[in-house]
């Protein structure tokens, strides 16, 4: 059974590629997370061909972790469902890399090694994997990134992503197959009216949750006229005064936050020896308070 740890907490991440063809103007990954120029990051994608073997090894290695720590965010620093990358990988590896990764998680689950897989995307091509994800729906959450409901505005800042319509269609397809879908508007472009329009659209297609952060990290006007090779104009901590932070569910009402006590990895001090907390949980884990949001469902 999945336990709530926190809104944005994921102990593990999995990225099968380095680089991304989507070319989003607001992308935080090149130069900041991965030390590559934006031009290189957006034009050259490296595929980690050995990731299936490494993944099987790692999932078994950490199988004894507390269940609330066995959470993997899939596709954080790259878009998983880039069409050209998927085709190239299948041609050169002889199999579908995403399908293989999903199979590994599913097989581990069937053998008693249960993990939660959180799939992040802004591409409609995820619907190719609907049948496979549907059989894993007890252990999968899909999160679509959408910055605005308007196609023209979206295309201005997201050069090569799927259209809003195709993303909404994919949300509907996944939802109709019983798969949990959340929409993430981070960053979000627009005002409260745009926000209401977007939430209405995604909930009408079957999305079960929506989240937005109070912080809007970018000065949107700085993107006008930029190219993929231009340096990112980042305004750290810029507040979006039009919106509060939202974490809502379709048909649900958010109630008072509560705190729960769970085990989390210890933070290392400078020079302190690394402790593998999967092997030595008593040494590597500490009790910590994590804030969670709980919901009461209401019928409208």
Regions found by a protein language model. Name each.
Residues 106-109, 134-137, 168-178, 248, ...:
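Surface-exposed amphipathic alpha-helices with a cationic face
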Residues 1-141:
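Conserved Radical SAM active-site core
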Residues 72-74, 117-119, 142-144, 181-185, ...:
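Hydrophobic faces of well-ordered beta-strands that scaffold small-molecule active sites
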Residues 81-85, 151-157:
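A short acidic, helix-capping loop that chelates divalent metal ions and anchors anionic groups
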Residues 92-99, 161-173:
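Glycine-rich S-adenosyl-L-methionine
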Residues 169, 191-300:
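Auxiliary Fe-S-binding modules of radical SAM enzymes
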Residues 160, 173-193:
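Conserved strand-turn element in the central/C-terminal portion of the radical SAM core barrel
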Residues 118-120, 124, 187-197:
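Active-site glycine- and acidic-residue-rich loops that bind
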């Amino acid at each position: 059974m999945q336990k709530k740890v926190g809104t944005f907490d994921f102990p593990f991440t999995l990225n099968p590629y380095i680089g991304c063809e989507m070319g989003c103007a607001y992308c935080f990954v090149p130069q900041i997370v991965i030390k590559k120029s934006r031009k290189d990051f957006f034009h050259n994608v490296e595929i980690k061909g050995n990731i299936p073997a490494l993944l099987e090894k790692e999932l078994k290695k950490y199988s004894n972790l507390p269940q609330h720590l066995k959470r993997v965010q899939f596709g954080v620093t790259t878009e998983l469902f880039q069409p050209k990358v998927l085709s190239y990988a299948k041609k050169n590896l002889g199999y579908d890399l995403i399908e293989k990764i999903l199979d590994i998680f599913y097989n581990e689950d069937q053998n008693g090694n249960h993990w939660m897989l959180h799939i992040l995307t802004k591409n409609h091509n995820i619907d190719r994997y609907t049948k496979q994800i549907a059989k894993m729906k007890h252990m999968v959450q899909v999160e679509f990134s959408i910055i605005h409901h308007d196609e023209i505005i979206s295309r201005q800042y997201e050069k090569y992503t799927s259209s809003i319509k195709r993303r909404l269609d994919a949300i509907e397809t996944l939802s109709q197959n019983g798969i949990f879908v959340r929409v993430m508007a981070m960053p979000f472009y627009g005002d409260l009216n745009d926000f209401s329009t977007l939430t209405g659209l995604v909930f009408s297609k079957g999305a079960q949750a929506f989240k937005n952060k109070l912080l809007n990290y970018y000065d949107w006007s700085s993107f006008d006229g930029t190219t993929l090779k231009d340096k990112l104009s980042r305004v750290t901590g810029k507040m979006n005064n039009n919106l509060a932070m939202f974490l809502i569910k379709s048909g649900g009402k958010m109630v008072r936050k509560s705190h729960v006590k769970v085990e989390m990895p210890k933070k290392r001090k400078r020079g302190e020896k690394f402790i593998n907390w999967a092997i030595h949980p008593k040494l590597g884990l500490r009790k910590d308070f994590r804030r969670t949001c709980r919901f009461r469902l209401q019928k409208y």
